[in-house]
Each structure stands twice: as structure tokens, then as C-alpha cells.
Amino acid sequence: MSKKKKSMYLHESASGAAPKIQRRYDPAFEVDAAYRASLPDMMEAAYAAIQGAHVPIQQVGVSNFKLPLKFRTKKGEILTLEASITGTVSLEADLKGINMSRIVRSFYDHKDEVFTGEWMGKILCAYLRNVKSKDARLKVSFSYPMLHRSLRSGLEGYQFYNVAFEGVLTRKGDYRRFIHFDFVYSSACPCSAELAEHARDQRGVYSVPHSQRSKARIVVEETQGKKIWIEDVHAHCLRALQTETQVMVKREDEQAFAELNGAHLKFVEDAARLLYREFDADEKIADFRIACSHLESLHSHDAVSVICKGVKGGFTADFMDFQSLVC
């Protein structure tokens, strides 16, 4: 008596039995309106289909979908840059979920337009309308190139900055715009510089004060009706700290950078206060928070500081993600 062939659900078995379910894709199949209308839609699920607590969700949506977007520089040049986009909306307690593809489609409907604060507001309104939600938020992150000249030789090179534009539209109709900006600089320790000079002066011993690559992460909120450019944020950082890391250098530039660091010694506390002074003086900026990290070459830990403008109901100094400032 022959043994019955054992079959599998999706694959032909080793004994030669055909699968119980045939897998195929029909590239010629075309969807018509009637077929589309027959497709199940989870948005139509009953209230009882909601799993877990029947409570609102503050943010639900999509993160890190990529799109080439157009950005205008302060000089008027249009740059097309790869952007990583996060878009979220609120979800009321009686709804199971949202149609996330509608958020993505909202961006594609406007992908050929130049990015502006108004563009962000238009996108937020569109996906509030498309998803039928009450609060919306988006964040567009990208690497922004700026051409800089070296300190003395005249060489030029591109510095790339981690930048993000963020927009928030609340159910009260408030629209808030933020710019996130990372600035990498060198910090030479004032204490170490003094001790090095003491060794040279008192004992004739040459020594090198410690300095290190450092990063400031700035987030600013634009004043209503005002426009602040990425280049403005960079200029504030450069005026405050002076010692931005260099791109293209010759020996004269390296020497100049050593002199520049000597002229602008700074603790991490100094960096925070210097930046505060610059950003606080700009009327186009309603609020800000600054986090600094000096990646100490003396210690096996980093020195950090956080400062905010102090606006009532605005930013607080609750930043703790210092590991993200490693550069």
C-alpha cells in the first residue's frame, strides 16, 4: 500500500504533492471602480474592533519616508535635497486608525513646489483634511550644504549641516514653526590652556592644552509673521562660538585655526551663554533651546549644557539625548 503524499500549504513538498494554495500574480488584472469599492477598509471597522484602551492617541503617522524637495537659500538659489519626512496626526478615541498613505500623498501633491513655511502649513492643512484629524505635525530633515572659505589660504569647501524644519498645527488653529540646526565647532579648555602656560613659564616644559570637537544643537521657534533663514541660524552660531570646524585647509589655515582656538577658549558653560546672547537678540526668534556637548579629550566622558530662552509655556531645558550629539 503506497504512502499518501504529504502536502504543504504554499510550496510543493519533497514528495511531489502540489501546494494546497496556489500562489500567483496576474500583471494583466485591472482594477475598476466596482472592484475598488468592494475592497475591505479597516477605517470602516466597528468601534468594538479597537484593541486595548479606548483612548485618544496624540501622534500616529509615518516616519522616515524619503522625498527630493526644493529649498531656497538666502541668496535665492534653489537646491534639490533628499529629505526624510515624519508626518503625524492625532487620533480620537472612537477611531481604530488612520489611512497613513494619505499623509504621504499629501506631500506628493506638493512635491514640486519650493519649501517654505507656508508650504508646510499647506501640507498640514491638507493631511488634516484628508485624514479627518484635529492636530497635525510634520518634520522635514535634510543635510544642507554651505560653501565656506578657509581662514587664510582662500580654499573653499562644502560644510553640510543637519537641519530640520518642523511644523505644528493644533486643533485651536495655532500654527507654529521650528528650525532644528546642528553646529560643529572646536572647544579649547581655558583651564588646560592656563596649566599649559604655567608649565612653560615655570618649568620650561612645552605642553598642549586639550581641545575637542564639539556640537551645539539649536532649535528655534519663528516669531509669527517673521522669516529666519538657515543661513541666519548658522551666522548666529558662528558669531557666538567663532571656532567652527574647517573643511579645506593648508598649513596656514591650520595655524590660523590654532590661533583662533587660542583667542576663543571656552567651557561648555561659556558656549551655552554665548549662543544664548546671539539668539536672544534676534526678534525673528520667539523661543529657543540650545544643547551643547564637548567631547572631552581629557576625560572619558563629555561635558554638556542646556539653556533655553525662558518663555512662559515655551521650551524647557529638558534635553537629555546627549549621545546624539557625538560628532
Curated annotation (Swiss-Prot):
GO MF terms, alphabetically ordered: GTP cyclohydrolase I activity
**One GO-annotated biological process of the protein:** tetrahydrofolate biosynthetic process
Disulphide linkage map: none
Keyword presence, Hydrolase: yes
Identify the Gene3D superfamilies for this entry. Answer: Urate Oxidase
User: Which branch of life, at top level?
Assistant: Bacteria
* Annotated site residues (May be catalytically important) in this chain: 189
A Pfam short name = GCHY-1
Keywords in alphabetical order, please.
Answer: Hydrolase
Record PANTHER family: GTP CYCLOHYDROLASE MPTA (PTHR36445:SF1)
Give the UniProt family note: Belongs to the GTP cyclohydrolase IV family.
Its recorded name reads GTP cyclohydrolase FolE2
